[in-house]
């Protein structure tokens, strides 16, 4: 196994920069390419933003020892949450419903319903959650999100269980 570097600050800051680039690309697709995000896409953006914020705080803090594991655990939980949304959307894209329904937007659902009612509606997905509007190398945005959340989860596991350089 590759040993963790003594100074993990550049690693955390690189994760922050990568998440910022992913979010910037999503905003580019939305504002300049006209691809409107569905509720699941927006939740994935929130998860990437949270991974980025956790990494930024860790990079500025420069933790050692148990602190690295705390940040690694937070990154793992956030990456798994975002990855589960991306996996659900990928599944919906592979097996779309017979007649997709266009549900309300995320903002409307969160304003009009309590969170306990809105979350199941979001995960049922709207008709546009199963649409594939953009691909790169044969993979949709949801597929790429799933891969990126998987990479973040692997990095978090490395932070949690990797050997330390003495």
From Swiss-Prot:
It is a multi-pass membrane protein. Its main location: membrane. SUPFAM superfamilies: DsbB-like. GO terms for cellular component: plasma membrane. Disulfide bonds join 38-41, 102-129. The keyword Zinc does not apply. Gene3D superfamilies: DsbB-like (1.20.1550.10). It comes from the Bacteria. Residues 29-46, 88-143 are periplasmic. The chain crosses the membrane at residues 12-28, 47-63, 71-87, 144-162. The keyword rRNA-binding does not apply. Residues 1-11, 64-70, 163-166 are cytoplasmic. Keywords: Cell inner membrane, Cell membrane, Chaperone, Disulfide bond, Electron transport, Membrane, Oxidoreductase, Redox-active center, Transmembrane, Transmembrane helix, Transport. Belongs to the DsbB family. Required for disulfide bond formation in some periplasmic proteins. Acts by oxidizing the DsbA protein. This is Disulfide bond formation protein B.
